[in-house]
């Protein structure tokens, strides 16, 4: 809140006044102000009187001709004056009168802005806004006002702003500010500013460095923004500003913005005297005049911030302004030269000193382009002039030109050269294990150099294609941009060493003659004492032999690359220079192909994909539940794959296409409202395990009951026929024989049996007569009681729970954390009509709190030119460099192309150095290691409230309240404190990986984190690459070493799939900032505070009566596949809320209009085969019963909008069949039990 000025109104004086120290209020005299209107009136009266008495001048045409003739005479008199006056006329034409907007801004600025000066130069401005003085933080200097310069400013790096409280006596000069910014045109010092699409733009050229801090005003003179800088976008320039949005400060920074503070002069040093780097002293002031002294001056200032300004100034000797072109980019190469260096394989299997030695091969670009550094120079001729068609190479001691057309690069096949400049070549090459560069010189001789190098073009995307398609998808990648302009990348150069050349010496009798050939030669002879020196003319050394002398050519007028294949200049030591190099690595987009869409066949809980890859294409899929079960496979030919679709959904990614998402539906071949075998098939396909278990248990129970019934019948039969079997000559009655299946010799008639029982056993006669009647009574009672049991079973199966209601305006509910599925809640309040609230999650974002431990990337090994100490011993010095190694090797005898480098045989030593730095690619190709802490959850919620759909965003923490019209919603916290991110994560190019990386300062060679830095631009670097210097080979000058491979590049190959593809619950992972979006896990509680005015009293709402519900059609587990028609009678016209009191049924309409006697149709969605639900309209409820059929589609591409209760539904038809089967089995058991009871009673009565 420090950067939001308080709004105070003060009357402004219209006449501007100079900025001086303000006197106290008592000193200001108001008398001149009271007299000012009278003076103005007198001036107005006199001006009107002069205008009235003024006469029209006569013959105006003649006077104009006279003026014209005078001009012609003046032109004819002096042609020199005419030439001098012409530029003055142009200057007067450029000087335009300020427009209305500029005049108004200048008038306001005279009071409210102050210059910020540094060493007498204006670097920017400070502005008085409200009760604060504001100044851009990047503007260096002090405010040009004694009172304001003393203030203590508070700094905000986030907004690039500094502010302080305005002194009391200056508050009247401050401008008001506003957060109201309708699109249109605003005013600033240089004219109009257009505000559109949340951006401020001006015509290109209207603003410049030094304008930082200027305010932008509206037409009322209020400040709407403060300018910080701008970004050139062609004809328009987008402004970087600080502005206000209600109670928040906002910084708008277009891409590519540059700060508009006036650059301060950078100072350089020469002989303990400082001077501006852009204006070097006259001695030396130009490389062309004094090359050696100029290079020395540059080496002295190589670490100064203005080194490149000094280099440009020293090379641009001409004082007049030159037109910039591509040649200026090559101007720096006139201070350098090509060189000869050692090559391990010059094309015939042997080493040599090659003019096209390979220094470095860079392959960081993900588009497969190689950047090759060689010892020759391309695009520069020997005369230091620019020529695209030429290259220059070192032949002996002098550079020689050759045609660029003879340059070639190859791996396993010829490469395509896409760019060349200086020491660098850009080429696109096929895969191979070696790389060869070469050229044909002017004598038609081919020079080549081959290095072992494993090259395989990297994979972009998920398809291994060979050529860029015409149409496809743009993916982020990196490439070497084809520009020869100065970049941030640089190489080190130094003075070349003395090059030995024994051909300069000839033996003449007993003397040695040294022929210099116009060169500077250093010689040393061991004959008749020490004889050494530096000569530019031929010299004869008497009484000496060639074997006793050593000659070397010295050239200190040019730099050469600091190569490990050439020795360091022994006199210069560590002195060096720097030059920019072309073709920087930048982030861009690459077009990749999109695989043909697969042929998709839907099955029951399965999806079958028929794939047609044009080239190897990656197929991956994951479940969107708790266990993602991620799989991936490279498809190289036509293939059919069948994948199971879980209930939570399936995400399939084919090639570079966007992911396909599938959800299963409760489809089946049977029906829940058919015959038993169809019902069994229906439930078996939906719930196979449960169906088998239920059928097995039911079969066991039925079999047990039937067996029990048979046992009771057998027991009763035995009891009945035993007395007749034991009685000789007894005759079994006819009816008993039929019931007990007993064979009789003579069957008695029913009349005879009845007569016998009447005479002998009258109780048995009555019992036998009541058996059919008892059976009928038992069956009727069983059928009567079965529905009661079935209602209990149905309740347990369906578990339909009514919606929660409250008796107050404070309402709480819980919605599932599923995006795109609407949820409704009913708010009932006594005395008021019920209110329906519909809520739908648009998105849910889980954002962890991150702490950056470090970034890691590919390293480069810096091996400076070795220092060879001839006839002596070199010593290592400690240096604070990452992974620094230094070793001194004795007994070396290095050779250069002209002979032995040293005069001694065995007393020479070589000092080899090496250390590690971040590669140039680290600015674009790096991975960030973060520690993740507590995550914050925010939700975007669509609320249907009072007939309006309103979308709000809030933190789901249970504390943050958002207002929807006049109601307050508090969301969260989530029921599950779950996050897809581990405690340690790695972010690389928009992808996130869970990884237990090593801490800062504990990296291991060849693994992730072998080189670490706080940020991509920071200088603090930790490295552990197992760098070990090795002894150089005999005769060669080089710096061999052993080192572990880059852990970053190894991690890129082995990192696997990112969280975007493997996160559970269907999370979508995004970066900038790192977050997980739409994770379908847990529930979100919502607390709603609804004011009394939002409710409608029962007396004001229509009364609905005579309601009836009829379901026209119903398809369960489908997107609102049910349609119900409700007939009603309303007391008056009005609007009623519609709500389902059953959680298993969701109604699409939140409210309906009712009037008179009519009917309305509602759409509902349910997962039940037999839906029994209540619909409430206003305060009246109606019961609906639906017989739903399964959907025809097995798979859909959207989640179900209904609530899944997690239990199996039993249809009414299935329940009726269960009742029938249960009743039949129960009847059989009851009859068998009754028979057994009667038989037992009769047999016990006999005894």
UniProtKB/Swiss-Prot annotation:
Segments for region (Dimerization of the capsid protein): 182-192, 218-222
Ribosome-binding, as annotated region: 98-112
Residues where lipid is bound covalently (S-palmitoyl cysteine): 720, 740-741, 1241
PROSITE patterns on file: ALPHAVIRUS_CP
EC number of this enzyme: 3.4.21.90
Transient transmembrane before p62-6K protein processing, as annotated region: 720-740
Region of interest called Disordered, as start-end residue ranges on this chain: 53-103
Renumbered ranges of motif Nuclear export signal: 143-153
E1 fusion peptide loop: annotated segments: 892-909
Swiss-Prot/TrEMBL site (Involved in dimerization of the capsid protein) positions: 186, 219
The protein's name in its UniProt record: Structural polyprotein
Species of origin: O'nyong-nyong virus (strain Igbo Ora)
């Amino acid at each position: 809140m420090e950067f939001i000025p308080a709004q105070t109104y003060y009357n402004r004086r219209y006449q501007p006044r100079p900025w001086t120290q303000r006197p106290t209020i008592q000193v200001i005299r108001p008398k001149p102000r009271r007299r000012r209107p009278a003076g103005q009136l007198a001036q107005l009266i006199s001006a009107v009187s002069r205008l009235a008495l003024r006469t029209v001048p006569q013959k105006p045409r003649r006077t104009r001709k006279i003026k014209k003739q005078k001009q012609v005479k003046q032109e004819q008199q002096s042609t020199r004056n005419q030439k001098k006056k012409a530029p003055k006329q142009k200057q007067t034409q450029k000087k335009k009168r300020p427009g209305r907007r500029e005049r108004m801004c200048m008038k306001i600025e005279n009071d409210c802005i102050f210059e910020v000066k540094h060493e007498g130069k204006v670097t920017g401005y400070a502005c008085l806004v409200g009760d604060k003085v504001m100044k851009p933080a990047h503007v260096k200097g002090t405010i040009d006002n004694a009172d304001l310069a003393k203030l203590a400013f508070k700094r905000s790096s986030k907004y690039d702003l500094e502010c302080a409280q305005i002194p009391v006596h200056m508050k009247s000069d401050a401008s008001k500010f506003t957060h109201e910014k309708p699109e249109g045109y605003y005013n600033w010092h240089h004219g109009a500013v257009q505000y559109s699409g949340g951006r401020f733009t001006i015509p290109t050229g209207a603003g410049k460095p030094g304008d930082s801090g200027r305010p932008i005003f509206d037409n009322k003179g209020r400040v709407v923004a403060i300018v910080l800088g701008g970004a050139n976008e062609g004809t328009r320039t987008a402004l970087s500003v600080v502005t206000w949005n209600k109670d928040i400060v906002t910084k708008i920074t277009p891409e590519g913005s540059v700060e508009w503070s006036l650059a301060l002069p950078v100072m350089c040093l020469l002989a303990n005297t400082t001077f501006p780097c852009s204006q070097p002293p006259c001695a030396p002031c130009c490389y062309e005049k004094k090359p050696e002294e100029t290079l020395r001056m540059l080496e002295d200032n190589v670490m100064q911030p203005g080194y490149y300004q000094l280099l440009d100034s020293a090379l641009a000797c001409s004082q007049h302004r030159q037109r910039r072109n591509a040649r200026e980019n090559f101007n720096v190469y006139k201070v350098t030269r090509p060189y000869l260096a050692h090559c391990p394989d010059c094309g015939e299997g042997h080493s040599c000193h090659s003019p096209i030695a390979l220094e470095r091969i860079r392959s960081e670009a993900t588009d497969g382009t190689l950047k090759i550094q060689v010892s020759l120079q391309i695009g520069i001729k020997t005369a230091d002039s620019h020529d695209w068609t030429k290259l220059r190479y070192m032949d002996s001691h002098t550079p020689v030109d050759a045609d660029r057309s003879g340059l070639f690069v190859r791996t396993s096949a010829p490469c395509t050269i896409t760019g060349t400049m200086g020491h660098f070549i850009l080429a696109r090459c096929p895969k191979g294990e070696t790389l060869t560069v070469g050229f044909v010189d002017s004598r038609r001789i081919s020079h080549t150099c081959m290095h072992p190098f494993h090259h395989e073009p990297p994979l972009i995307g998920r398809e291994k294609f060979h050529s860029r398609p015409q149409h496809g998808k743009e993916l982020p990648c990196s490439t070497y941009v084809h520009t020869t302009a100065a970049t941030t990348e640089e190489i080190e150069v130094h003075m070349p060493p003395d090059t030995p050349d024994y051909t300069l010496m000839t033996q003449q009798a007993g003397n040695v003659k040294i022929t210099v050939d116009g060169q500077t030669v250093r010689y040393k002879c061991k004959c008749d004492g020490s004889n050494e020196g530096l000569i530019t003319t031929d010299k004869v050394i008497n009484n000496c032999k060639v074997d006793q002398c050593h000659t070397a050519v010295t050239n200190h007028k040019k730099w050469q690359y600091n190569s490990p294949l050439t020795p360091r200049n022994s006199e210069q030591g560590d002195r060096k220079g720097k030059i920019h190099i072309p073709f920087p690595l930048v982030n861009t987009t690459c077009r990749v192909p999109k695989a043909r869409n697969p042929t998709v066949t839907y099955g029951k809980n399965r999806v079958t994909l028929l794939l047609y890859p044009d080239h190897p294409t990656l197929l991956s899929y994951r479940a969107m539940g708790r266990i993602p079960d991620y799989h991936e496979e490279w498809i190289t030919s036509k293939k059919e794959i069948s994948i199971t679709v879980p209930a939570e959904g399936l995400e399939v990614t084919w090639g570079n296409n966007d992911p396909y998402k599938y959800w299963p539906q409760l489809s089946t071949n049977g029906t829940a409202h058919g015959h038993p075998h169809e019902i069994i098939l229906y439930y078996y396909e939906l719930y196979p395990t449960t169906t088998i278990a239920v059928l097995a248990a039911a079969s066991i129970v039925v079999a047990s009951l039937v067996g029990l019934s048979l046992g009771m019948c057998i027991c009763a039969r035995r009891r009945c026929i035993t007395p007749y079997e034991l009685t000789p000559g007894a005759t079994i009655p006819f009816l008993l024989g039929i019931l007990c299946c007993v064979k009789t010799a003579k069957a008695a008639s029913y009349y005879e049996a009845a007569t016998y029982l009447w005479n002998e056993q009258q109780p048995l006669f009555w019992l036998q007569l009541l058996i059919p009647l008892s059976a009928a009574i038992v069956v009727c009672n069983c059928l009567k009681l079965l529905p009661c049991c079935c209602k209990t079973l149905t309740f347990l199966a369906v578990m339909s729970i009514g919606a929660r209601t409250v008796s107050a305006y404070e309402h709480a509910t819980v919605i599932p954390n599923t995006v795109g599925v609407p949820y409704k809640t009913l708010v009932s309040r006594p005395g008021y009509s019920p209110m329906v609230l519909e809520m739908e999650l648009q998105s849910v974002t889980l954002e962890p709190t991150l702490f950056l431990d470090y970034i890691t990337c590919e390293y480069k090994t810096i091996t400076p030119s070795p220092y060879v100490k001839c006839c002596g011993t070199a010593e290592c010095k400690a240096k604070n460099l990452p992974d620094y190694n230094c070793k001194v090797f004795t007994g070396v005898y290095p050779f250069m192309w002209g002979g032995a480098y040293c005069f001694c045989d065995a007393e020479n030593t070589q000092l080899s150095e090496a250390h590690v730095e971040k590669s140039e690619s680290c600015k674009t190709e790096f991975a960030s290691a973060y520690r993740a802490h507590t995550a914050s959850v925010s939700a975007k919620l669509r609320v249907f409230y009072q007939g309006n759909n309103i979308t709000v965003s809030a933190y789901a923490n249970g504390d943050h309240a958002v207002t929807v019209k006049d109601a307050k919603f508090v969301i969260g916290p989530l029921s599950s404190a779950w996050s897809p991110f581990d405690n340690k994560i790695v972010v690389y190019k928009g992808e996130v990986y869970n990884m237990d990386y090593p801490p800062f300062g504990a990296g291991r060679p060849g693994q992730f984190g072998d080189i670490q830095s706080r940020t991509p631009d920071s200088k603090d670097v930790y490295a552990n690459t197992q760098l070990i210097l090795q002894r150089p080979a005999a005769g060669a000058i080089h710096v061999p070493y052993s080192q572990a491979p880059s852990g970053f590049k190894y991690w890129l190959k082995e990192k696997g799939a990112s969280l975007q593809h493997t996160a559970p619950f269907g999370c979508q992972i995004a970066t900038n900032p790192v977050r997980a979006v739409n994770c379908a896990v847990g529930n979100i509680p919502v607390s709603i505070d609804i004011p009394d005015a939002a409710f409608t009293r029962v007396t004001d709402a229509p009364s609905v009566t005579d309601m009836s519900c009829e379901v026209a059609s119903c398809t369960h587990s489908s997107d609102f596949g049910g349609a119900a028609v409700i007939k009603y009678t309303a007391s008056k016209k009005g609007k009623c809320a519609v709500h389902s009191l059953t959680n298993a049924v969701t109604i699409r309409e939140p409210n309906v209009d009712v009037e008179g006697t009519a009917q309305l149709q509602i759409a509902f969605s349910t997962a039940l085969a037999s839906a029994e639900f209540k619909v409430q309209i206003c305060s009246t409820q109606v019961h609906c019963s639906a017989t739903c059929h399964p959907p025809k589609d097995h798979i859909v591409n959207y989640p179900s909008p209904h609530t899944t209760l997690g239990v199996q539904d039993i249809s009414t038809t299935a329940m009726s069949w269960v009742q029938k089967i249960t009743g039949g089995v129960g009847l059989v058991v009851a009859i068998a039990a009754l028979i057994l009871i009667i038989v037992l009673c009769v047999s016990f009565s006999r005894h």
